[in-house]
Structures are given as C-alpha cells and as structure tokens.
Amino acid sequence: TDLKKVEEGTQLLLGDIKSEKELEIQVEFHENVPLTIARNGDHLHITCQEPAHYYRGLNWAVLHPEDTWNTKSEPVYFSKNGVMLDCSRNAVFTVEKVKSFIRIMAKLGMNTLMLYTEETYTVPDEPYFGAYRGRYSQDEIREMDAYAKTFGIELVPCIQTLAHLHNALKWPLGETVKDTADILQVGKEEVYTLIEKMLCSVKESFSTNRVHLGMDEAAHLGLGKYLRENGYTKSSVLIREHSARVFEICKKLGLEPMIWSDMYITANTGGSYYDVADDTDCSDWEKPDPELGLVYWDYYNPDQEIYEKMIRVHQQLSNKVIFAGGSWIWNGISPNYSKT
C-alpha cells in the first residue's frame, strides 16, 4: 500500500467533508480482516484490507463525531465492488465531475469504477471515432486514472467491440467494418485491425489490465452485410468466433477481458436473456474461453430464485462471473428506488 497516496487521499477527503475537527489517524492494512474503526477521544485507529475500506471507515468516523461509540466493525463481502458510469448517452461527464464521483465512491468504500465509453474516447488515427461527442483524450483518462488510484479505486475501461457502435459506424470508417448500422462484421480483418487500435488506446490510457469489451445486445448479428457475403451462420457460432478473436488480441496486449453475457445466453437458447430453464445443462452450448469474464447484468427481476438460476448458468460458461445490478435512473428525472 502506498501510504503517501493514502495521506494525499485523506487530505482530499477531509477537505471534501469539510471537517474542522482535529484528528490523529492511525491505519493498519492486513489481509482477510473486517473494517474496524476504534476511537479514543480524537484518536482514530482503523484496521482494514485496502485503502478503499479505510476511506469508508474515515468518512463514517468523521460524520459521527458526537455519537457514543468506541468501536465499529463490518465484514467485507466482495473483493471488488463499484459502479459503471455511463459516458455514452448524449455527452460525457467532465473530468472534474468524474473526480467528484470518485470521492463519493471513496466515502462508500468502493474500489472499482467502470467508465462506459462506447466510442467517447480517443483512438489514434481514427479522427471520426467519438467526433462531436465530447470524447475523452488519452491525457484526460490518465488524469482520472491517477486520481482514482489515490483513493484505491481501479478505473476500468468499458467499451464496445461488437454492437452499440452506431455513433462510430455512421462515419466513413463504418463502411468497411459494419455488418448492420451498429454492429461490426464478424470475421472481417478490418474489424480486428480497428479493435486492436481501440485496445491499444485503452492500454495506453488506463493503468489497469482489466477491460470490459461489451458485446451485448447484438440482436441482428450476422444478418446484414455478413449474410449477403457469407450466407447464414448461427449467432451462437458468430459470438464465439468473434469473442475468441478479440480475446487473442487482449492476450497479445496483456489485457484481462470480460464481456456482457447476454449474447451467449440468447444465441444458444433462441429465447430471451432470462428465459432459461432451472435445470439448464450448458454442456453442448457454444462457450467462450473459460478465462473470459462473463458479466451477468440484471436490472429487472424481483425474485431471488431467478438470480440464483442465472448465476448457476453463468458458472457453467465461465470461471470468472461478475454481477452487474442497476440503479434505476433511466425512466424518469429521479431514481426509481422500488426497482433499484
């Protein structure tokens, strides 16, 4: 643990909280321990696993100065816990806004921030990629990345390497690589040249080796230019072939990829994402590389049994399963707490 960064983050966080109370703070980092805050007058002793947990403890202690407590302890349930910021709808968050969000995350003890940028980041030699959309420069991403590391937060690129690319493919670059208006054409070499450029930009901008490749909701995969040039191929085969090609590029660049999982479910079953039988056997399914992370996203279902079923299915498909829930802010001007 970089204690200089912890000290820097402490000063930034205390300034953000606007605490005027003088505190003497001692922190210890150990493996596999709960977050524990002990108070003796103006002395705080915080024991935890990592900086993100420390900042959560510090924030709690500063916000409860008059409460009658001496020790507070809470277990750590997840090794990685955080949020994804959508920087692809309309425009991106400014760098300063992302920094303010990072400070909020630090107060909550989160250690992962995914930056969802479909094409709102810079790809060298592709001037129309993210044009007029407020795309981040590589230096802006590096600035946010360094700031996040101050608080023990990993900034993770979350991009798109198959679908959801309408705003990129509407430009001339799309003519040689698109299958349909927003989907890349599987198997075309120009596609993988472009994806390697994307991933090289990501590698140069972010300090993490983890990358989210997207690949969700490609409902018309293989049904556009691909169909005219190659004939019909099952979408389950196309998603496996495409993810394998992109996974090889990631290995070449030393990146650890993950993708949204819905195409591997829907392409194999022919049904909807969550319409999977309880006793589903995935042994004869088209599967990704076992080391490719699968992100199970579920923003809708109210029943625990559905989540348990879907997790069982995912564990048959990948050794690395990540869960993504949703804070419902997309159906009105205020959060929908009943659905979150």
Feature-to-residue mapping (PLM):
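Feature activates predominantly on carbohydrate-active enzymes
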Residues: 40-258, 323-325
